[in-house]
Amino acid sequence: MSGRAKVAGEEALVGVAAPQPVPAGILDECTNVTVSQPPSPPRPEESDCAGCLETPGEAAALPCGHSLCRGCAQRAADAAGPCCPRCRARGAGWARRRARDDWQADAEVLGERARRGPPERCRPRRDGGAAAAGPRPEQESRAAPAEPEFIFRAPIKLSKPGEFREEYESLRKLREEKLQEEKTSEDQIHKLLPEDTEIGKRKMDEQKKRDEPVVLKTNLEHCPARLSDSENEEPSRGKMIQTHRSAFVSKSSSYSLAFLAGNLNSKMERSQSCSDTGQDRAKSRLRAAPTSKAKATAMTPTSNPIIGVLLSTRNHRCLSAPDLTVEKRLPFSSLSALASLHKPERSISPESNDSISEELNHFKPIVCSPCTPPKRLPDGRVLSPLIIKSTPRNLNRSLQKQTSYEASPRILKKWEQIFQERQIKKTLSKATLTSLAPETGDDLLVSEVTQSNKEKPLLALNTRLSSGQVLSECTGPTAPDLDYFSSVSQTKAEQGSDRKKNTEIPLETCCSSELPVGASGTSLEREQSERSGSSPDAKLDKTRITASMKISAVNSVLPKNSVLGGVLKTKKQLKTVNHFDLPNGVLADNLGDEPLPSLRRGRKRRCKTKHLEQNGSLKKLRQSSGEVGLAPTDPVLREMEQKLQQEEEDRQLALQLQRMFDNERRTVSRRKGSVDQYLLRSSSMAGAK
């Protein structure tokens, strides 16, 4: 608006009556302003219309304190953004509300405000403009603007000092207490769980123990005809209390011979395979009866081991590989203790048997019993289940000889002697010894064999025959036989130097070596050994006689084109044989200082290579034969010995000359430009040169 319109409006208001004062409650409700002091008269700009600057007859109050006449208020409500035309304060909700109303209340309020206003301005309009035409004073006193009212608002307090920290501490304490309670409960649970588990196991075990007799009784009542295998057989109802002895009987178990005699028939009947017919089982029972009688009559400490050899059944497994842990701790001189021990042989027959005989037991028929519970018939009877049996071939019958048969007392003693000798060999072999036993062990072996042979000479000789240590008259000498003769001669040569200590050893050794010659020579030499006196000279003479008889017997047995290639008459003639010309195994292993070739198998080689061992053994043989130093009394033998010595010297000289000749031939000329400068040069390179 222009200033002229303002002046006109002010002039028109002169002479209007002063409005009456408005109650304070109504003013507060309309303006939303807290008034702590008595209300002051409104300013002229507040009472005028904010839009047209005229005092409205019907006015509407805005939230900002300004008022609008009816027309300006309608325009402000219709506008897109209704706001106060003077202070630009937005009041959209107010404008819409006032547009709906009839503006009556606002008009009354504004009328009262106008009546309270300055009389000089309101009087002319109230009077109808009578004084408006009068002259206006030049300077109109205006009321000074009122001071802004002070409104005290209390500050909003979010929290007290330290209240947040206290709240945080309390929350943390609650969390810690909760964790502690959870941990305590978990520990208690962990403590109770093992106890509950142990109590449950204990209850289960007690329940099983209480149920076992009932189950066994029920099984025996419902399944009386249960069958089982011979190896895994369960005891029947009558034998339930007795402990069941397995078929694998350990060697160290000290069961008595009476137990063997009483249970032999039952074991044989149980060990019959399912493929055996009734006739075979009847035959085995017939064979078992006389065998048990023979065993009962021969129940002596010396015949104890042979029971394990002769009274074993075909399908029985009690005769497994021997365990020598007990024999290792026995002294060497306890031959009777070795004989009295019950040590089963590895094979169940006196002949050697391979290892497949024990593995064939895995192919025995297996009895398969059904595991389903038995069915009951409608009348209450129990239906016994079918028993399924597998019937493979009985391989044991074809591969093993039957050994449960009667034998004469002489054969029994002979086999007992074989058994004892095998025990001694296995005990004294260096592969099974835990302590050092040098050559004294060999002498002890020969002395003990001599002592046992004096009591039973015939059995000892038969033992030598059966153990494979002598020559065969039918087939003639072989390489192991020659090995045996050389070892015997060397044994006598070594033992001749110690004839005062062991005077009976050479004679008995010679007796055992004279067996292959013939029955007459054997009996003659045995009589000489038994009737010999105690003088060392007589024993040495008989030793020489034995050597001559042995060599003559060997000459008669050897063929003309023999490897030895000559007539052996003395024990020194063995040195004339060139060991490089002999086949392997003839004199390579027997020229050492072993007394018996059967004990050579378990010994360690003294040298790391065979040629060193052979050379060393030849030297030892010459030294041992030279230590004897006994000149033969027979001139023929003396001449033969000189001849052999000359041949040996000639042979040594020839060997030395041959070595020198070979060394000269191997010497290569290394002169520059020689053809044979490099022996390994190829022909192509030589041609290129």
UniProtKB/Swiss-Prot annotation:
Catalytic activity: S-ubiquitinyl-[E2 ubiquitin-conjugating enzyme]-L-cysteine + [acceptor protein]-L-lysine = [E2 ubiquitin-conjugating enzyme]-L-cysteine + N(6)-ubiquitinyl-[acceptor protein]-L-lysine
Record's subcellular location: Chromosome; Nucleus, Nucleoplasm
Any single GO CC term annotated in Swiss-Prot or TrEMBL for this entry: nucleus
GO molecular function annotation: K63-linked polyubiquitin modification-dependent protein binding; nucleosome binding; ubiquitin-protein transferase activity; zinc ion binding
Transmembrane segments: none
Compositional bias (Basic and acidic residues): 110-128, 178-224
Enzyme class: transferase
Protein name in UniProt: E3 ubiquitin-protein ligase RNF169
UniProt organism field: Bos taurus
